[in-house]
Amino acid sequence: MSSSINGLNESEGSTPLSTASIIGSSEQLYMTHDERYLDVLQQYEVETENKRDFDLEEEQWGVLSGSCVDGTYWSAEEKELFFQAVARNGKRDLDLIAYSIPSKSAVQIERYINALENELRWLRNHVDASVRSQCLLKYEDIPIAMEMSQNWIDWEEKIAERLLEGSNISGVETSHYNAQSVKNKTSNEDLFDTNEMRKISERFYHFDRQAPFPSNPLSAGATEFLLQIIKSKLKELIGTSIFLAESRFRKLEANNAFHRKPIIKNRDVVLSGKFLRFHRFNIPGFWKYLPTRQKMNVYKRNKRLKFQNYIHIMESDERQSKLKLGRVRARKTKNNENTMFFDSKEHSTDESDGNLGEHDVKRKVDSVPADETSINGFKKSVNQAEYPDNAQMFMDESVAEESLVEIDDSVEAYDMIQSKNYESFVWKYVLHLTDEMSTEDALFETIPLSNLLAQKRMKDKLKGSDVFTTLKITSKSLHNIDEHSDSDDEVQPICYYYKDPVVSHAPGAAEVVSELESGYVGLISYDLSNLPNSTEDPERKLAKPVSSWELSLPLK
């Protein structure tokens, strides 16, 4: 009995479930038909609108008809395909246009395009603007459209489905992250995985973490070095400016009626900078020691030059450059003086006698010295046969003279030409970066101060003997040994450095001179007087050589 009741209940309960499923399926079917109806209606409206636009266009511009264009017959269908292909691919892509019109070749299509362009050009040049506006379309009237391929449409549909389903790649990859570990982190900075970022950056940029030429860090000694330069140069500038300001009032101070104090003006500071040559650059030193600063090897005819030989060659080129530019400037000054003299003489003659004959003018012109171009041509013709180097030098002088004529006769123009000459001297050689420093380069780069201290003691011992005098006389290096500067007694001495440490005993004069001359490397400016009292180990402390054009710092 109970089983029959349960069966009845199950049969009764099955009826409403089947009814709900039927109702749900009918609603889904209704929604599907409704969406389909809306799609068909929208498509019909679009087609109707396009047909209306096409009918209006035909009413306005007419229907294409067949005609002969440049000896070739074009039917209405071919013209329609032609304009569709031009709108899709452009008028320059003849191959794609010819692919769309199988009955026409690329040459025939090109002739049709040229005929249309010529007609358009004639219409723009010979038809009034009011009439032309009725015959031609404007760019703003042309609808903006872009034609997409079926592959692009399929890809867009696929991306849209992924966005709706929530199955994008980033969601799949990040779904396994532990949310509890993220909550336990203290700050937002902990969310960055620095190790993974480092790996990604190394894979992306493909270069080593360490630079090939790492620069030395700026130490406290370098900062003090720069501050000392600024202080010393500023002191010189202020002192010279005060001297110039006082010189302007020197005569007025002699009279008791005037009791004014000198005032430093702007022109005093500018003139002081020119007196101290702050506005000039050491151009020869810059280009001469460029390979040394950049740690380059110098090669000439596939042979590496030593530093001393390279400096000697550059100094000889420097002397020739100074001589050449000096002659050019002297010649230019003389030409300017001759021109000014001739102009003033001609002006005074015109004022005294307004009517000069052609013969007198010709005689005055002939009396002027010959043009420098003829002199240069004569020098060039004479020296080319006998002295080729001199011919090249005179040719360089003419080029430098033309540069001086084009630019203003100023210090900046002279420095620019001089810098170009020295730069050309440097690039005559082949320069390569040094991969591995040799023993000689290593000694030249860093030098123990203990060697300098031994040398200073040796020099102090020999100062009163004949050995030191012989050493100073027979020294043929770049500079002499100066104990003090001529301008300031506080400037520290510039000392020679030699490869081998100088012995403490005093040998013969000839042995000292030969030993020191053979071991000469460069110049070093350092305060050696305070070195014995210093707490630092002189064996560990190293010094670098300074160039001949670098200045020493005043002691504190």
UniProtKB/Swiss-Prot annotation:
One annotated Gene Ontology cellular component of this protein: nucleus
SMART domains recorded: SANT
Keyword annotations of the record: Nucleus, Transcription, Transcription regulation
InterPro entries per record: Homeodomain-like_sf, Rrn5, SANT/Myb
UniProt keyword annotation of Transcription regulation present: yes
GO molecular function, one term: rDNA binding
Any Pfam family the entry gives: Myb_DNA-binding
GO biological process: nucleolar large rRNA transcription by RNA polymerase I; transcription initiation at RNA polymerase I promoter
Compartments it resides in: Nucleus, Nucleolus
Presence of the UniProt keyword Transcription regulation in the record: yes
Biological role: Component of the UAF (upstream activation factor) complex which interacts with the upstream element of the RNA polymerase I promoter and forms a stable preinitiation complex. UAF seems to stimulate basal transcription to a fully activated level.
Subunit structure: Component of the UAF (upstream activation factor) complex which consists of spp27/uaf30, rrn5, rrn10, and histones H3 and H4. Interacts with rrn10.
Descriptive protein name: RNA polymerase I-specific transcription initiation factor rrn5
